[in-house]
Amino acid sequence: MIHTILPTPKKTECFEGVSILVPAIGTDHAAFEEYLPVFTGSAKRIFGLNVALAEGGIRVEYDAALPENAYRLDSREGLTLYASAKEGLLYALATALHAVKVKNGELFCEKALIEDWPEKSYRALMVDLVREWMPASRVYKYIDVCFLQKLNHLHLHFVDDQRFTLPSKAFPLLPTPEEHYTEEDIRGFCAYAKERGITLIPELEIPGHARHLNRCYPEVFANELPEGVDATIVTEEGLTISAKNIVCAGKQSAMDGIRAILQEICALFPDSPYIHLGGEEAAIKAWNYCTHCQAYMKAHGIEDEYDLYSEFIGRVTDMVFELGRTPIVWEGFPKKGSHRINRNTVVIAWESHYQLVTDLLEAGFRIINASWQPLYIVDGFELRWGPKEILEWNVYNWQHWWEHSAATLNPIHVSPTEQVLGAQICAWQTTFEQNINFVMENCTALSERLWTVKRLWNLEQYHKRHHESVRRIARLIQDR
């Protein structure tokens, strides 16, 4: 329904009455035809209605005057959607799925005129597929959530200490038995996401969170430590990180192995412009004792493990650039080492601890906001945030609950800038069943705050729209 559409369209003019619609959708613009089944398939799941691919019902028309990311919806006489490119078309189809209603088997839409486009270009959900294994069928549901709520990126955390959930021919022992995605699965994810305008972002977590790599191929990736040396570290938040969790930054075999895995990831995800490399929570103390790392540091004039950390991030991000993709890393490297990393690298600022967003912006990096508070969903964590807190936040704010974060007592705010590309919800260490309700609700609120950066509604006004919007997502992703 028009008044419950989220994210809120830029311009909406409502008129009295409704337009009764023939349950069909068609276009005479050949480039748009392949995307119309996205609407018909979604309408079947949301409304239980068969919408034909035919003329005489909803019209989809090409309008060269519209920017690629914009669309118009006109339901004054029937329902016509206008766009100039795939991006705007898919936003129009998602809006139409929110705008139409079915009653007594009849399809109709309130009479209105909508003009709409997004403000922030990066609107994302991240899902942890490692700590809790999820079958392939669940991944499709996250893609559906992104499509209907106009989030245009889905960041998939495939690799961590517990599992390696990607296929690999270069290192066949890496894929966790019975708990990894096949090449066919990945092709399915890519095709489904592409049809819906969702960019998939695969992640290879290095140099930390790499216990699985070291366990399967120690001769390739592991540090070589003297017998009896314990390089385990305990973080300020009490997290114990073993030296077994970090790859060696000194031996060539580790770098060759990382390159081989990255090449496989690029082949698996041909349409993904980004590759995420992790880059935080690493037990770099181990590098002080590793014979290969010490030799590398001496040969390259690297002063300490922190400098090596930044230099390593610089090397692996350069690999990604050489492969024709753009690297993304977590905010994990120190300010002192920023000069070692290509400024075209995108940094996700989340903790406000390793390096502050103000310093990252000053250094010239582009930023994604993943402020732990209110954008994290973590199982077993006593603090949890929902639409209320996300509405109160904005894309230029960083907050945290943790006493060691610089954003705890005094949230960090930066001036509006195009360097801040957008933001993402992060769902960690949860099963699908544990996180999906939070994902649906929080992604809806995040999309509202990124589609238009200026806040439009108070909590009561927002909730009048929120319930129906989330209900339609739930119907779209429910098992049949």
Regions found by a protein language model. Give the residues of each.
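Flexible, acidic glycine-rich loops studded with aromatic residues
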Residues: P327-P334, H339-T345, E351-R480
